[in-house]
Amino acid sequence: MVLNNRQPVKNTEWIAVESLKSKISYTALLIYNERSPKMPASYFKRKVKAISVKEKSISQLLAEMSETAYQGRKLGEAVDVWEAMVKEKDLVIIMGFSGSMSTAGQWKIINWLIENRYIDILVSTGANVSEDIVDAMGLGYYQGTHYSDDQELLKADVNRYYDVYGKETDYREMETLMTEGLMTLRKDYPYTSAELLYVFGKYLNKKKVDSIVATAAAHNVPVFSPAITDSAYGEAFLMAKNQGHPIILDQVKEFDQFVSIGEKTKNVGVIYIGGGVPKDFAQLLAISVSPRTMDEGVPGRNGHLRKGLKEYYYPHKYAIQITTDSPQWGGLSGCTLEEAISWGKIDTGGKRAVCYCDATIALPLIVHALNERVKIKRKAPDLSWLFKQVS
């Protein structure tokens, strides 16, 4: 043996040196362990499980993804939370449905959720519950490209939704049908959007146009659209008015009607596809105070009292959010469910999942997994009382 290129040493000397080095290392390790914080076993309860490629259902794949990481894990967890909602008794499930998803082929998924009562209330942009009518009329949308020459599309009367094309003539035909339907409504009655869309949905059912609001009306599922005029409905309201048939919308009555839902349920679960007005409207149900229950709270509900204000709030027990927006810009679409806890809108002990993903990817996968996984028929709450005045 040679140490540091010096004179050879005997094996016994080499062993002694190595033994000394080992003792020094062991002593250093003991000192490190004594001075370092102990790592709790709770950090290591659930191992990440690698996904094996084999034939499997969507439900099984998402179950395996929930045991991995990043947004794949969150997508799998979203299925778990939704499944728990469906299986819980005395729960109202509200979906906030933002953007222009119907033009992207998502509207029949919403119909299925309504028919099977995996949602009890839909809060939607006007776009989602109007642009689906084009497709339901048999007209449809077409795959295009976002590299289009938009000036040429304008000349050809083609409307572009990112990589989807729609005919302007089809849109006008939808608006005409919508106007005809709205002109069957009473001129002297102040409608909420839920009442209006219920009556209009019945009209579409008679026309065999199986859109979202038609399906909802057939199953007594309320559809609220707080910003309904920001869509083809706004155009249809104007056209009806110009033909001597003005429609009255009462947004204060609408909000009071929505808040009253919280007085007739034990717990609430929410699913947000995107954010915007639909999300905020549904979130307000947790904290909005009705004069009817201001002093003593809602009987039968586990409310929390803001002692300084002497007001009750009722955080949503379950929550799912599918979004591509980020929280640091301050907008509601990217606002985390954890931030909503500070407002009293989301239950600190409830089940929740946030997945940052394009909804056209997440929604079909989640709903197909639910279809495979949940075998019980849900006993859904009866919300037909909301339509009592217009039935």
Which residues does each predicted region cover?
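C-terminal functional extensions of proteins
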Residues: 297-391
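Short acidic, glycine/serine/threonine-rich loops at helix termini
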Residues: 105-108, 133-139, 234-239, 282-285, ...
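Glycine-rich phosphate/diphosphate-binding loops that line cofactor/substrate pockets in enzymes
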Residues: 79-92, 215, 260-267
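N-terminal glycine-rich anion-binding loop in soluble enzyme alpha/beta folds
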Residues: 39-86
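Glycine-rich anion-binding loop/nest that anchors nucleotide
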Residues: 93-102, 122, 224-228, 246-332
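A generic, well-ordered mixed alpha/beta core segment in the N-terminal half of proteins
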Residues: 111-173
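Ligand-binding beta-strand-loop-alpha-helix segment within the catalytic cores
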Residues: 152-233
